[in-house]
Amino acid sequence: GRSFALRLGQAVRFQLVSSVGDTPWQAGELVEAQGDDFVRLPPIATVLPAAEGAGRRDVVVQLTATMTEVGTLEMHCVSADDPARRWLLAFQLRGDATSPEPPSAAEHPRLPAALAEIERVFGGQSKQVDAREVRGLRARLERLLGPREGWDLPLLRALFDALMERAGRRRRSAEHERTWLNLAGYTLRPGLGAALDEWRIERLFGLFGQGIQYQQEGRNWSEWWTLWRRAAGGLPEAAQLEILEVLAGHLETLPDGKRARAPVHDAYDDMVRLAASLEQVPALHRIEVGKWLLERLQRPAEKMHTWWALGRVGARRPLYGSAHTVVPAEIAAGWLEAVLALDWKRIEPAAFAAAQIARLTGDRSLDLPDALRDSVVRRLAASRAPESWIALVRDGGRLGDADQRRSFGEALPPGLRLIDVA
């Protein structure tokens, strides 16, 4: 077999792939792992111990793989000089063992049946599945697993992993693509919170450059942008900047008046919500997004989602982003003045936008002047806004579940809360 140099006493990482193709690869055969037949697996990251006092050193090893009696795969590095010396490569499928995790989704008694439903629609074999059956996949999953609002994080990620393994077959029809995008985004939201989410996000973002297949379908565009909004919490800055650049290109070509709209523009609301959800991009870019939103809001017929987006972009506390990407207080104050000039009874979302922009954090670099926040408190009280909104501006504190749901755009998985970033 092939030999490798293994570094002991230092963190090492092994990238694994599996093949879903029909080629019978032989053990030890060198293969170019390219194309849709290869699927990236979770990497093995570990430190293989050296003998006491030996420090870091290289040893020549060969890889062995065996299937255990219970059907799991074990991999060892075996010393070429002394076969009795071997190191088990542990698959880090549960994250840090010191971090308590909910019970595995495999314990859900109906999960195998749910995975079979996903396989029927997106499986490798060519099955006669009509459009109605594809559309009904989510309903069938809910009949098996209960209402989707109750699906916990391990179950959601098990479903996402099954969908991701079959991502290459999402393009069979417009219905396939739309259904896959909807379910993949829902089961990965908010893009963080579970072991291996970083790896899942990395795999998912590999699809971004491909775009959608059925570009004449406005509903497919809507699901496409919603997918990335739902996953945005786990997307790194570089990925978010790439998404924002593509979004800007589409939004800049938005037609005025009665000019013909492209199908992508049918998903305008979803594009706006996604742009506001990209909290990892530098503040300079978020300022540009906010300015563009304010310009759009000068139009009498502008959608209400744009007010939600302005509040999210100007928020003093990001849902998952870093504090250094928050829009500077002096700029946010200017936005808030524009919001205060409105009739909140006529434009209900403006009140929540104001509460987010004026929220007290206790950080002088982020907080707006007291007089401006007092004005917001009075306006919120006069418009009979929820007490929780008034408290955010007057006293600060954490978002309640309902307000976090409103900020995120939908409910988070059961048991998961986004903690405010200091």
Regions found by a protein language model. Name each.
Residues 117, 121, 136-140, 144, ...:
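Charge-rich, solvent-exposed alpha-helical interaction surfaces
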Residues 121-128, 143-151, 162-173, 187-190, ...:
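Surface-exposed polar/charged interaction patches
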Residues 25, 87, 151, 180, ...:
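A residue-identity detector for tryptophan
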Residues 1-195, 293-296, 418-422:
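Acidic low-complexity intrinsically disordered segments
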Residues 75, 135-143, 176-190, 218-234, ...:
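Amphipathic alpha-helical elements of HEAT/ARM-like alpha-solenoid repeat scaffolds that form extended
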Residues 134, 138, 152-225, 236-269, ...:
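Long, leucine/valine-rich, helix-dominated scaffolding and oligomerization segments
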Residues 1-48, 234-240, 253-301, 305, ...:
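Acidic, glycine/GT-rich loop-and beta-edge segments that sit at the periphery of enzyme/chaperone cores
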